[in-house]
């Protein structure tokens, strides 16, 4: 590609509305332009990167045995009504009607469409297992699109869906997809971690997320220092450590006027929050008459509730909803002063986090306004219904597999794989004839990669004060050739043209910067756009039989002979 025929839409200043580095650099490097909130036009520089990401994804998916399809982004609402997600999905699902008043949605995902395809095309167990994938546009009507293409409303995704006769077959494909994703992200040049994850609104059982490590990541990911254990913070297990000591203090009630938070109480009493418990009162599942019980959760004072874990408890309503003021008043409780003493006797279910369950002589609310209790002990002073893992893990917690301790880092989710089970196949009646001649509900898996998000996450992980530092596999160009004074020096231009043709013939993706611009402008553009290799050709170098080479991360350029240069590029 000749730069004189390419769109270099670079910006010298950072746009004010760009918060994260990937958004800033994608705008400055001329990769994208904003059309509307959460909607972006991809310019030629960005499309080249997108195409390279898609090519790697497509190669590895084909290698895995998956079959490529292409499904409409516009989907009949009736399919979503069949699955139950038309209402459940919420306002992120864009709903509309065509001119014939038929309801449609703009697809945020394609479980319904692929299941409809499968129920019409798959007839026998002999056709299974089978795995379909596509690379297609999605639309989610985010309430607050942010961070450029990191959280946009319209985006490109690779989504795959597999169909099986049983769980064992699904597990084989799931493991295959896990390995495939590891190959994809390795080839993309990303520092990533696969982690155990919650299935969320997609549903199903087993699930793994793939995170690119970056300080700007929105998610906390947890991994062991000495094993391959890894999970997102929603899923990471907090193990029980230690045993409860025998009581050494008598229970005492102390005045704590206007001290409602654990931090306030412990400061007021000059106590360690680790030696206290805090109460969270939530709503349970309604009974047959519609009555909603209140459930009391207790955690150690310095720990935070993991709402996803709480929602998975069979007695707690999902989504997690905290008890109302009216419910507290009916129970005779005051927010900020609730302790476990006497709650079981009142008929409440009391669930205690593992770490809180081993405390003795701790501080708790006294179930009376402006008062707390010290020297509280389980069994003697307060009963509980059960012990349950309720909290977020913290740095230094023991790893659940018994190897090492946990570390927490920030990550950007770029991939997610699920074992869906029969959630969608049952809802849409997707069956095949089994080997006994009877209808068999198929078992499903789904596997997604955010293609546009991969581009942004690669930048979040690879940049400096000059611009992007692309992994070679996805750089818009691998090599840039800059002929000095090309418009005045036929000798330089001729040498540049010859090297350009030779490198292209060897399979390199080369940019010949033949623009009539100052060298400083060209060098700044090439550093900003992240091209890995820069070759400068000048008359002095040609006379000496050398080329000036500089790698994107090199501090200084070096003069190389042609043979040395070609060896350097390999």
Curated annotation (Swiss-Prot):
Catalytic activity: tRNA(Pro) + L-proline + ATP = L-prolyl-tRNA(Pro) + AMP + diphosphate
Superkingdom of origin: Bacteria
Cellular component GO terms held in the UniProt record: cytosol
Keyword terms of this UniProt record: Aminoacyl-tRNA synthetase, ATP-binding, Cytoplasm, Ligase, Nucleotide-binding, Protein biosynthesis
SUPFAM superfamilies (alphabetical): Class II aaRS ABD-related (SSF52954), Class II aaRS and biotin synthetases (SSF55681), YbaK/ProRS associated domain (SSF55826)
A single MF term (Gene Ontology): aminoacyl-tRNA deacylase activity
A Pfam family it matches: HGTP_anticodon
Localization (cell): Cytoplasm
Domain characteristics, as noted in the entry: Consists of three domains: the N-terminal catalytic domain, the editing domain and the C-terminal anticodon-binding domain.
Name under which the protein is recorded: Proline--tRNA ligase
Species, as recorded: Acinetobacter baylyi (strain ATCC 33305 / BD413 / ADP1)
Gene field: proS
